Each structure stands twice: as structure tokens, then as C-alpha cells.
């Protein structure tokens, strides 16, 4: 999957660990949306 920046990772993509994965059809079971204002396409989810 494509990594994405969770709210808990910090304010900027540069220099922070991207702990989320972008899911196009919503977060799968057992995952949660980790970005309040998430990517333009899909959802930024993490386990």
C-alpha cells in the first residue's frame, strides 16, 4: 500500500515516520482512520 501521514506522526511529511496506509474503500476491519482531515483520495488508516 501507499504510506500516509497519520495525525500522530507530526505536522509534516518530511522528517516524520509515515505510519498509515492509504485504503481507497475505507479502513479494513481492525484498522482505524488515523488522520482527521485525510488524503484527497481514500482514507489514511493504521492498525
From Swiss-Prot:
Protein species of origin: Anthopleura xanthogrammica (Giant green sea anemone)
Keyword annotations of the record: Disulfide bond, Nematocyst, Secreted
Chief place of localization: secreted
Record bears the keyword Disulfide bond: yes
Subcellular localization(s) per the UniProt record: Secreted; Nematocyst
This protein's record includes keyword Disulfide bond: yes
Any coiled-coil regions, as ranges: none
Other information: Is not active against sodium channels (Nav).
One GO CC term on file: extracellular region
Entry similarity comment: Belongs to the sea anemone sodium channel inhibitory toxin family. Type I subfamily.
Disulfides per UniProt: 4-44, 6-34, 27-45
Official protein name in the record: Delta-actitoxin-Axm1g
Single GO MF descriptor: toxin activity
GO BP, sorted A to Z: regulation of signal transduction
Lineage: Eukaryota, Metazoa, Cnidaria, Anthozoa, Hexacorallia
InterPro entries: Anenome_toxin (IPR000693), Myo_ane_neurotoxin_sf (IPR023355)
